[in-house]
Amino acid sequence: FYFVWQLDFRSRKYPVESFMSPQVADWGKALLLFNNGFPINDYEDADWLAIHGANLFGNDKVSFSERVQWAWDNEDNIVKTAENPLDYTWWTEADKTWQFLGWCFEWYGLLREGWGYYTHLPCAADGSCNGLQHLSAILRDEVGGKATNLIAGDKPSDIYTDVAEKTKRLVEADAEQGHEIARKCLTFGIDRSITKRPVMIVPYSGTQHACREYIQEAIADKIEKKGLENPFGDDLFNVGLYLAGHVWQGINETISSARRVMDYVKVVGTHYADAVKHMEWVTPTNFLVVQPYVNTKKRLIKTHVDGNLVYLSYQQELPDTVNRSRISTGSSPNFIHSLDAAALTMTVNRCLDAKMMDFSMVHDSYGTHSPNMPIMSQLLREAFVDMYEKHDVLQDLRDHAEKVTGDSSIPQPPAKGNLDLQEVLKSEYFFA
């Protein structure tokens, strides 16, 4: 069967089906196979299937060659899992449990049948905090580009670990001054699990308040799931508040360009609000994005249902108004979402030109059959580079805003750095 897809107002793509699709939770994805199969004829064809399995298990911070070797080294575990998953539960240790179990069945099929085995399993390559990849590319930020794998390296860069290390150094400085919470934080440990979600929300107008909440949740999760001793007692709020300040500073040091892009998009949004116009822009795929944010007024309806008096309330949209607050909070994440949607569109078009017809797509995770993954990997890089070399998206945003609002006082975009986007074409771990 085929999935029916729809586009939202930013041109992001979503399957209409909500129960089982390439964009649902782990268990739903685990049920999906491509109708068409492709033969795995040699080790090169099998590489991406091996990489995909390592990624699903959680062994995704090492080089590709180490991930491939991991799959071959675990042949015994995989065979036992595929033959008797109810009794041999090694697979339950995987990060994405159900998809990994499905992968074990596929790898077992390859081991059993050998070269020529027809694979139907979607294999995925994920972006490195994809929103930050776009933000770094927009301003040609070398520091952010290195942290998000826009620049080639022997192993994948991990921005969450980078921010965790910066945070740890700041906390160590406080601990040396006798700061009690800092000392407890160092004893507990500051790693990527603490900083991952705060970093992930940055491209989407995440706040320091949200950062504190995510840090508290991460600490509580480590205590509960890993059985770590809790040195903080009932004081997680103040611990989260303390760490949030340092995590926020670490983020700003790592991806300063991201802040400048988001702040600039918000500035452009204020000019739309001043002109009482809905904010809009045109993406590199020529898709017109319009933010339909208007003010609302609460209305109360009094009616009778089955002899009982019932009050119903609803929000009535007020015509010829714009919601200044929603423009401010929504403009930056919507802008970035529209750009990752454009990159996905351009990638799929290139794949179709290359006669590839099977896709398993999320906005920051592109998938197809293992033998075709090298082709898709090259095409998605070409699409990304082409998009940002041919389109100055901030200048386009500004010029379109002046055209719509008639306001020539909109400031020019911030200056760019020296990142060479051609480096993306050589970066193995841009999508990995």
Whereabouts are the PLM-identified features?
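Conserved catalytic core of nucleotide polymerization and phosphodiester-bond processing enzymes
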Residues: 1-432
